Every structure is written in C-alpha cells, then in structure tokens.
Amino acid sequence: MHTKLVTIETNTDQPLDGAWYEPDGGSTVGAAMICHGNTMNFYVGAPRFLPPALTKLGFACLSFNRRGHDVLSNRNSRSVEGAAFQTTAEGMEDNEFAAAWIMDKGYKAPVIIGHSNGGFLGVQYVSQHPETPAMVLLSAHAGGTLAKHELPRDGLLAGPKTLERRKEAEAMIANGRGDEIMVFPGWWYVATARSYLDRLTTMPSTVETAPKIFCPTLYIRGDQESRNGYPAEDFSAKSSGSCDVEIVANCEHYYNGRQDEIIKLVSNWLVRQFNLESILNH
C-alpha cells in the first residue's frame, strides 16, 4: 500500500486535507471515499483503520477532512476552523469536492463509506449521485430532528436546555454575532451560534432520503447504540436499493475494540458486491 498526503481545494480559502491510499501495483477495482464523523478527522477511526484492508481488495481510498474537522483547529495562522463552525450545506459541498478530486484522477464514481455524521452526509451525497456503485454506512445518524430531540435526551450539546440555547443563538445571529462561539455542557462542547442553529434546523432525514438510494448499501450499528439515533432497519425498509443490516455485538459508537469485526464485515460485503472472491481467498 502506498500512502500520500493530499490537499483538495474548495470554494473558500480552507482546503480539505487527506490521505490517498493506493494498492501496490495500483487499483484494480475502483475507488472508495471515506467520510469521518463529527469532530473527528481522516487519521482516526474508520478513515484510518479501513484503508489497509480495502487496498488489499484492490480499492484506492481517499480519507479526508471536511472543513468541519476536529472541534477547533488552526493550520498556519491564528485563524481557527473545525466542527464548531460547520454547517450541513458545507459538509455536503465537501463531499462533492472530494468525489470530484477522485474522479479527476480518472476513477469512476467511488464507493461511499461514512461513519456517523460522515454516513449521514454520505446518504445525502448518494441520493444526488445514482451512479454510486455501493455505500457503507457505519452508524450513520438519523438526521432530521435528531439534534432537536435525541441529542438533548442524551445530554449532548445543550442537553435539556436546547430550547433556551436555541433562542440565545437566534438572538446572537440577529445581532450580527452568528460567528461567535457558544459553550455547551455536552459534546461537542463549543459551536458558533450559526453552526448550532444550523444543526438544529437543516439536517435532512436519513430514513426519508432512503427511497432516493438505488445502490446496494451495508448499514452497520453497534448493539450499544440507539436504534432511533442510528436507524439501520428503518433505512433498509425504505431504501430503493438492497440494504444489508449488521448489528455488532459488544460495540459502541466508535467501535473501540471491535475494529477487526468492522473490517471483516465491510471487506466481506464488498467482496460479494464486486465479485472479489478470488482476491479474498488469496
């Protein structure tokens, strides 16, 4: 496997950083695009542990940062970036930039693989790109009213004070302070007023988008995760394409200690979808 750090231009001054993984001898199957979860990045979680397995199957892989990576970060100045500033629309744009970068290298439409918020955004991308050959959802969240109802119950972001903090964010935006940071008691702890309100109001529903998905899908969820928050079965029932659901035992949202099982499930499923049995047997 060969690995190269890459930079992908966007429509702002902030590019997307990532890693491009190629099999020894080059890709023989196609490409995969791996999308990280909220406040994560391309060198942790699935974007890190999946490429070695996928390149063995013949896939080239792009693991990349969205502009909303980590919680807060800075690169070559004191200007900061990260998930505290992210919007749903920006995340969707970033997938378009990343996929276009892959196809500019001569590849056909990539397999889309996304963890958590990366999976949520992946569903929206694939709904607009029916040429996508396959999609893997790793605990893709429900979108829709998730931030409004589920996250407060789980104590995330503003928790039970969501309505109160939403009004505060709306007032800040009305007063021209939309880019100022708000502090919250729950993960991910800080967000601008604009980003926080965006999170509460702009996310499409993953399940309601399912009828627009025509490619085969693998949807994985850990058994310690909420079915409402990560609605694999409901998505499968509504998808226009086939959708296989796998519930992993003794598994939480970040797959700690269960990475090998995730790798096995994803690899075996891709082998079946792309008729790669001869590669797996070697």
Q: What do the predicted segments below correspond to?
A:
Residues 251-262:
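Catalytic histidine-centered segment of alpha/beta-hydrolase-like enzymes
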Residues 39-51, 230-231:
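The serine-hydrolase catalytic nucleophile loop
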Residues 1-25:
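N-terminal cap/lid segment of alpha/beta-hydrolase-fold proteins
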Residues 82-104:
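Alpha/beta-hydrolase active-site loop
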Residues 136-146:
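Active-site nucleophile loop of the alpha/beta-hydrolase fold
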Residues 223-245, 250-251:
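Conserved loop-alpha-helix segment in the C-terminal half of the alpha/beta-hydrolase fold
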